[in-house]
């Protein structure tokens, strides 16, 4: 029984010596030789043995990690009768333990709901077992420490004891295997006549040292290889050395041998670097970690440092280097890319390497949390926990597990979208609404629905789809909830979930996905679908095994299962025989690499700026270790570990070492280079830093040609170079050659044309063909005024809404348009009620106004937006506020009616083919016509002598005025159109001709009076009346004005209309008036605008041409902005800037352009 230690720096040939020595021994005897290496190194070591000629494969040699050796020995000697718990199972049990003890916890009671907390606890428990720290020892160590540490240890103790109780000596963790291994080594026949070789470790846990001690007693020989600086073990331990841990391991092994009475053979020390093939790489590896500064005098060979503009430029530069290396004879498997921050690079690397046709293996396990199956389970449980809220329900729906597996996915998705739209629009946010008896009724009505018509065929069809999809969700989910609510034990909860997955045919769906992925060549995706089911099956088995008999409630079950789901990861396929490996530096599984790219070498990353992580802070660990705790040291006391990690990287390649860093992140934030790079540049005076550029145009032709490395990747660069050429920059012949090369091959030519077409891209539309326009809009265009205003705002907006029939998804929320409908509906109802009872607006009392408003709101509230005003306390309050506005409006109209001779003769008057008034007909080109239809809020009439006047009142929920500029540009046609229609059809409406008296906006709002001093009730009433003044444009005729405000006196301004009388009886310039002739001109011009719009629509006008008037544009509230892609920074996308001119100028233009009908 002997111990031998092999020591030396990396690359000095320790592993090669051990393999050669074993190879020679195998030829001479029949012993078994067992190599023990770290878990992540077993595959690489096996590959090395298979490739070693003198070992004749692996006959007589076995490769194990400590855990795999434990499994082998326990299989032989007994001890595997207990169930093994995975990391997922451990975290679930820890969560159960924490939940059970939650009320007793002093410091972690809130942390029990924090994501990652149970993973941190699992790591701490793992460390305690590895370092053989009992919970009693920890409690003892914390006795004299701060309250904070004491409380932490108190909570950890409670959770740990409960955790151990739940395991009940029936389950094994990974660390338990090593404890059992140490106990069973003496009983193993397999270990008779064996020699053990331990390689690849920089340190050993207490548990591992215990196992090594038992191996010393049992086996013929134990050889341990350690990477360290030989002078340090000859001259004593350096507290700050990067080899501190391995030097401590060296002394610990010698102490073990002494305790066991094991003979120590003469140590073998290796000093010469045999791996590095160039003097510069050998010098860097040999001098790293020395306290004494040493510099390299010559120009370094095969050692490069690169700066990059950003991470993408860095990876693209590396991809070009790799392509060149392969051209020079290297294999992809000779090359590795290592980084400290893999999360910043993995997706980027995958994309870039694919573009450069570089096969790449990314050595990173991915969480399963985003797989549709895992998301389905989590969302289903959340839906039940949160009373069937919209978000979790449709997160589950979108995974497709509710769908009929025999139907096409695309059809099911369309049906699910229809259901989702219905749920959103109807505010279905709880279980009661989902399970309400009877079919859900579909009506294509939004806003106020006072007149319910029979359902159309389309509505009936949509309703059948909605209820079909509803039942696909409700049936299984309601069954799951019923079974979960009845469950008491872990077993019952697990069975409820399992039966739910059976009910939705989860296995069959995952299998169909797997088969389809395989058929399409996506083998990794196929494996993921396969693993998803096997992982959930294993998770439920473990849950039942450990917690099957435990009493649980629904909250505890979902929390524990949620912890398990968070811990699930996809297992990795081993790399193929020829791939570049991208790996995290700390977990890299590499041997015999020729080329290393160390990327992301930034300050704070290498060396890592240490932060507290885990249950104990660095301060906590230092305090506990000061009290003789055997926990691992804090990060700040492991200063040398960062230097050692860097040393592993720089000593790994035999041929070439590339070090690089980005100068900025994706957001442009400046990033500094690593101190290690500054140190290397200080050592190598002749080392010149190069730059990976995003734009190579500043380089020489020869340097630019190095950027052309693959057809797909070069296309992107070529496009950017040609863009610059279009802007007047010189283009190297290198890029013209590249351009021409794409058109020598038909397949590449197609790809190039698709990509390069972006050079000529303009965000412009082409006019529709005449037949297409007529098919979309009809030869007779039936249109509303607002539609025509939309056309003049932006032709494409009109096309999207009325041609393509696009519309926003409806939401169960009260919008401005809904409030407008309530106000219109209230005024219509009150007016109709007054007419029915032969009452006049001006004769109402204040109390009657309030009562009318209240009755109107009572009638309307259930009829707006699927009863939204009755849906919650918040909506009840909004209803109250709306009632206040309606009451105030009723009172103001009552007051105005007392001072006006005008009375309503029409309310909510429809004009159109089926209206009270015929449509306004506008002749168009090619014998087509435009028929205008719509609804007029209110038509007022007044008479004096033989003159009859008509005016239009429009109720608005926001402040409006009539701007002639907007009329001229077609943006505000409504009021003058309505006036034209009623004056034109006066004979039909009132049995006589009439004059236009004006158009006025009545603003319905809650009014407030601002005053610097206290006002009387009379003064307040006067101020409120002023704020209720209607805006618009009225006839500049004293008779008409006096009829509108019978109280208006000379020298005063009206409180009802926009008019002011001077002392001489004339209207002042501050009045908003127009003559009869001007009104006629405007009416004629408005008709001309409709004719212009109608002809343009039939001509196929669909330009993306939004206007800009002052700071206002239609894009501000446009539903289709993301669809049209309007971008003012593009020369092809510019606003139509509209001039805001004086009324006189506008009227002159109208007169000139108005035309005749």
Curated annotation (Swiss-Prot):
Cofactors demanded by this protein: Mg(2+); [4Fe-4S] cluster
Binding site residues for [4Fe-4S] cluster: 794, 1115, 1118, 1124
Domain UvrD-like helicase C-terminal per the UniProt entry, residue ranges: 272-590
Enzyme nomenclature, EC number: 3.1.-.-
GO BP, one annotated term: double-strand break repair via homologous recombination
Cofactor binding notes: Binds 1 [4Fe-4S] cluster.
Protein name from the UniProt record: ATP-dependent helicase/deoxyribonuclease subunit B
Keyword Transit peptide included in the entry's annotation: no
Upper classification of the organism: Bacteria, Bacillati, Bacillota, Bacilli, Bacillales
Binding locations of ATP: 8-15
UniProt keyword annotations, A-Z: 4Fe-4S, ATP-binding, DNA damage, DNA repair, DNA-binding, Exonuclease, Helicase, Hydrolase, Iron, Iron-sulfur, Metal-binding, Nuclease, Nucleotide-binding
Subunit field text: Heterodimer of AddA and AddB.
Pfam families per record: ADDB_N (PF21445), PDDEXK_1 (PF12705), UvrD_C (PF13361)
PANTHER family: RECBCD ENZYME SUBUNIT RECC
């Amino acid at each position: 029984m002997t111990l031998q230690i092999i020591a030396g720096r990396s690359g000095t040939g320790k592993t090669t010596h051990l393999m050669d020595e074993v190879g020679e021994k195998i030829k001479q005897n029949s012993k078994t030789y067992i190599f023990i290496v770290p878990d992540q190194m077993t595959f690489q070591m096996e590959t090395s043995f298979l490739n070693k000629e003198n070992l004749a494969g692996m006959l007589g040699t076995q490769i194990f990690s400590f855990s795999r050796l434990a499994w082998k020995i326990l299989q032989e000697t007994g001890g595997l009768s207990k169930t093994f718990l995975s990391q997922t199972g451990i975290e679930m049990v820890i969560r159960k333990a924490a939940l059970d003890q939650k009320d007793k916890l002093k410091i972690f009671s809130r942390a029990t709901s924090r994501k990652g907390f149970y993973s941190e606890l699992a790591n701490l428990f793992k460390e305690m077992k590895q370092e053989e720290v009992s919970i009693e020892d920890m409690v003892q160590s914390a006795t004299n420490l701060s309250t904070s540490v004491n409380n932490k240890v108190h909570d950890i103790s409670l959770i740990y004891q409960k955790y151990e109780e739940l395991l009940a000596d029936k389950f094994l963790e990974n660390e338990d295997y090593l404890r059992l291994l140490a106990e069973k080594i003496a009983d193993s026949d397999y270990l008779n006549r064996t020699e053990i070789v331990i390689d690849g470790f920089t340190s050993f846990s207490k548990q591992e040292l215990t196992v090594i001690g038992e191996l010393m007693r049992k086996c013929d020989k134990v050889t341990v290889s350690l990477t360290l600086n030989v002078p340090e073990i000859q001259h004593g331990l350096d507290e700050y050395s990067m080899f501190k841990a391995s030097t401590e391991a060296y002394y610990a092994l010698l102490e073990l041998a002494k305790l066991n009475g094991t003979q120590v053979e003469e140590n073998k020390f290796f000093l010469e670097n045999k791996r590095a093939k160039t003097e510069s790489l050998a010098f860097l590896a040999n001098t790293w970690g020395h306290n004494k500064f040493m510099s390299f005098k010559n120009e370094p060979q095969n050692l490069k440092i690169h700066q990059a503009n950003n991470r993408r430029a860095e990876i693209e530069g590396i991809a070009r280097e790799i392509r060149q290396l392969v051209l020079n004879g290297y294999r992809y498997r000779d090359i590795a890319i290592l980084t400290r921050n893999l999360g910043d690079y993995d997706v980027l690397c995958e994309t870039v390497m694919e573009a450069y046709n570089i096969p790449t293996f990314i050595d990173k396990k991915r969480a399963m949390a985003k797989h549709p199956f895992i998301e389905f389970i989590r969302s289903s449980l959340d839906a039940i926990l949160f009373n069937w809220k919209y978000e979790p329900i449709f997160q589950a729906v979108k995974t497709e597990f509710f769908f009929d597996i025999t139907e096409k996915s695309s059809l099911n998705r369309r049906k699910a979208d229809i259901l989702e739209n219905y749920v959103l629009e109807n505010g279905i946010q709880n279980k009661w609404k989902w399970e309400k008896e009877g079919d859900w009724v579909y009506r294509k009505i939004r806003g106020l629905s006072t007149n319910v018509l029979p359902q159309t065929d389309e509505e009936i069809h949509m309703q059948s789809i909605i209820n079909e999809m509803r039942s696909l969700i409700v049936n299984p989910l309601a069954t799951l909830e019923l079974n979960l609510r009845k469950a008491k034990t872990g077993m019952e909860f697990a069975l409820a979930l399992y039966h739910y997955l059976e009910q939705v045919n989860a296995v069959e769906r995952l299998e169909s996905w797997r088969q389809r992925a395989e058929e399409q060549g996506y083998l990794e995706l196929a494996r993921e679908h396969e693993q998803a089911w096997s992982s959930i099956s294993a998770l439920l088995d473990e849950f039942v095994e450990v917690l099957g008999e435990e009493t649980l409630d629904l909250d505890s079950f979902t929390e524990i299962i949620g912890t398990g789901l968070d811990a699930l990861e996809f297992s990795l396929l081993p790399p193929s025989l020829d791939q570049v490996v991208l790996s995290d530096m700390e977990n890299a599984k590499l041997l015999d690499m020729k080329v290393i790219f160390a990327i992301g070498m930034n300050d704070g990353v290498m060396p890592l700026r240490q932060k507290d992580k885990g249950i104990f802070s660095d301060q906590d660990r230092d305090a506990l270790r000061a009290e003789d705790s055997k926990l691992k040291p804090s990060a700040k006391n492991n200063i040398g570990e960062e230097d050692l990690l860097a040393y592993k990287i720089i000593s790994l390649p035999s041929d070439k070492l590339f070090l690089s860093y980005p100068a900025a992140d994706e957001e442009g934030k400046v990033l500094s280079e690593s101190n290690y790079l500054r140190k290397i540049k200080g050592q190598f005076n002749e080392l010149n830093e190069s730059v990976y550029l995003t734009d190579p145009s500043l380089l020489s032709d020869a340097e630019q040609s190095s950027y052309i490395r693959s057809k797909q990747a070069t296309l992107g660069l070529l496009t950017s170079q040609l863009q610059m050429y279009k802007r007047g920059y010189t283009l190297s012949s290198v890029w013209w050659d590249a351009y021409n090369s794409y058109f020598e091959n038909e397949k590449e030519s197609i790809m190039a044309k698709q990509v390069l077409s972006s050079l000529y891209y303009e965000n412009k539309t082409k006019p529709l063909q005449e037949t297409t326009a007529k098919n979309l809009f009809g030869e007779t265009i039936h249109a509303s005024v607002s539609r025509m205003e939309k056309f003049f705002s932006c032709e494409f907006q009109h096309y999207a809404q009325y041609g393509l029939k696009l519309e926003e998804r409806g939401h169960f929320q009260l919008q401005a348009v809904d409030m407008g409908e309530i106000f219109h509906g209230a005024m219509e109802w009150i007016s109709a009620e007054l007419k029915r009872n032969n009452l006049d607006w001006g004769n109402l009392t204040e109390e009657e106004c309030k009562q009318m408003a209240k009755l109107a709101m009572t009638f309307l509230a259930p009829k707006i937006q699927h009863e939204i005003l009755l849906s919650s306390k918040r909506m009840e309050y909004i209803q109250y506020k709306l009632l206040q506005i309606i009451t105030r409006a009723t009172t103001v109209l009552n007051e105005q009616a007392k001072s006006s001779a005008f009375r309503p003769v029409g309310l909510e008057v429809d004009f159109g083919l089926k209206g009270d008034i015929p449509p306004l007909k506008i002749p168009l080109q090619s014998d087509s016509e435009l028929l205008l239809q719509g609804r007029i809020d209110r038509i007022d009439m007044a008479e004096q002598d033989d003159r009859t006047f008509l005016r239009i009142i429009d109720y608005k929920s926001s402040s409006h005025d009539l701007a002639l500029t907007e009329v001229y540009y077609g943006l505000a046609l409504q009021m003058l159109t309505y006036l034209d229609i009623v004056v034109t059809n006066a004979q039909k409406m009132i049995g006589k001709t009439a004059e236009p008296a004006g158009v006025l906006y009545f603003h319905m709002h809650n009014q407030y009076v601002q005053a610097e001093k206290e006002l009387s009730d009379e003064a307040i009433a006067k101020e409120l009346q002023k704020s209720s003044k209607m805006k618009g444009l009225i006839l500049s005729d004293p008779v008409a004005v006096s009829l509108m405000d019978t109280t208006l006196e000379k020298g005063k301004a009206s409180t009802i209309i926009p008019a002011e009388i001077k002392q001489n009886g004339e209207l002042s310039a501050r009045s908003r008036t127009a003559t009869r002739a001007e009104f006629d001109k405007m009416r004629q011009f408005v008709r001309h605008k409709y004719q212009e719009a109608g002809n343009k629509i039939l001509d196929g006008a669909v330009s993306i041409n939004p206007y800009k008037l002052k700071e206002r544009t239609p894009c501000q509230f446009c539903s289709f902005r993301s669809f049209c892609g309007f971008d003012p920074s593009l020369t092809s996308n510019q606003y139509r800037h509209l001039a805001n001119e004086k009324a006189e100028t506008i009227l002159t233009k109208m007169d000139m352009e108005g035309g005749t009908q």
